[in-house]
Amino acid sequence: MGCCGCGGCGGRCSGGCGGGCGGGCGGGCGGGCGGCGGGCGSYTTCRYYRVGCCSSCCPCCRGCCGGCCSTPVICCCRRTCRSCGCGCGKSCCQQKCCCQKQCCC
């Protein structure tokens, strides 16, 4: 089950998303999430320790990654372009991240 795309699950997402998930995950987003370290400052990175944790389990990175990722990634929510490590090896720009096949810079 997990918390893929449910939006309202803070912290570790243990126990599911409790209501209002609408449509479910649509794909194998199993398991929970690791801890989402740190606050949400300009230079914060949130690390996802399991598959399917983009945009719902880490509040400060919500909206940075679109949908589920196929592998655990480091999603950078930064205002400047830096190395991203989200799979395509380019960069993150304007608080958006390249967790899909193409970067959104």
Swiss-Prot record:
What keywords is this UniProt entry annotated with?
Keratin, Repeat
Q: Where is this region: 10 X 2 AA repeats of CG?
A: 4-41
Which is one Gene Ontology cellular component term of this protein?
intermediate filament
Origin superkingdom: Eukaryota
Q: What biological function has been recorded for the protein in this entry?
A: In the hair cortex, hair keratin intermediate filaments are embedded in an interfilamentous matrix, consisting of hair keratin-associated proteins (KRTAP), which are essential for the formation of a rigid and resistant hair shaft through their extensive disulfide bond cross-linking with abundant cysteine residues of hair keratins. The matrix proteins include the high-sulfur and high-glycine-tyrosine keratins.
Misc. remarks from the entry: Human have a similar number of genes as other primates despite the relative hairlessness of humans.
What's this protein's family per the entry?
Answer: Belongs to the KRTAP type 28 family.
Supply the name of the protein.
Answer: Small cysteine and glycine repeat-containing protein 10
Species whose genome carries this gene: Homo sapiens
